[in-house]
A protein has these predicted regions:
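HotDog/MaoC-like acyl-thioester-processing domains
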Residues: 19-22, 28, 99-135
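A glycine-rich (often HGG/GG-containing) alpha/beta subdomain
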Residues: 4-14, 26-29, 84, 88, ...
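Hydrophobic beta-strand-centered segment that forms part of the acyl-chain substrate-binding groove
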Residues: 63-99, 107, 123, 127
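Catalytic strand-loop segment that frames the active site of acyl-thioester-processing enzymes
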Residues: 9-54
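Long, low-complexity, compositionally biased intrinsically disordered regions
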Residues: 2-3, 77
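Active-site beta-strand/loop microenvironment that shapes enzyme catalytic pockets
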Residues: 53-66
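A broadly conserved detector of short glycine/acidic/proline-rich loop/turn motifs that flank catalytic sites
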Residues: 37, 41, 88, 100
């Protein structure tokens, strides 16, 4: 598997592929990409020994880190809902689909093999006007 970048921040060590699709116009749009958390990722340590799964907060951080690739100053202000349907296990490929609505509303779904593993509704700051593209 070719890995094009390593995400920084809390999700350090996760491998994020280039966006499959990114359609952002002003403050709305969508981003779809893939991520992979190797078995050695620190998120799996202690959660749970012998039965590793990615902690729920890292599902949220993954979405935020992907958004930060498109908007410089994205910060989480509220978790409206977070539904964890199935665990993300070590070495699984995770499809991440993010929809950006007006006034900071974010809807995200994480999937493994086409099956939803988490559904998130977040409120963020830092998405005002056109995106500040990072180089």
């Amino acid at each position: 598997m070719k890995v094009d970048k390593y995400i920084l921040g809390v999700c350090s060590g996760a491998h994020i592929m280039p966006p499959v699709a990114a359609m952002i116009s002003g403050r709305t749009g969508s981003v779809s990409t893939r991520a992979w958390f190797p078995a050695e990722h620190t998120g799996f340590q202690g959660h749970f020994p012998g039965n590793a799964l990615l902690p729920g907060f890292l599902h949220i951080e993954l979405v935020l880190d992907i958004l930060r690739d498109h908007f410089k100053e994205v910060e989480l202000t509220a978790v409206q809902s977070a539904k964890y349907i199935l665990p993300i296990l070590p070495d699984q490929i995770v499809d991440v689909n993010i929809n950006i609505a007006l006034v900071g509303g974010i809807a995200a779904q994480l999937q493994v093999a086409g099956v939803a593993v988490s559904v998130l509704a977040l409120t963020v700051s830092g998405i005002a006007g056109a995106p500040d593209q990072k180089s």
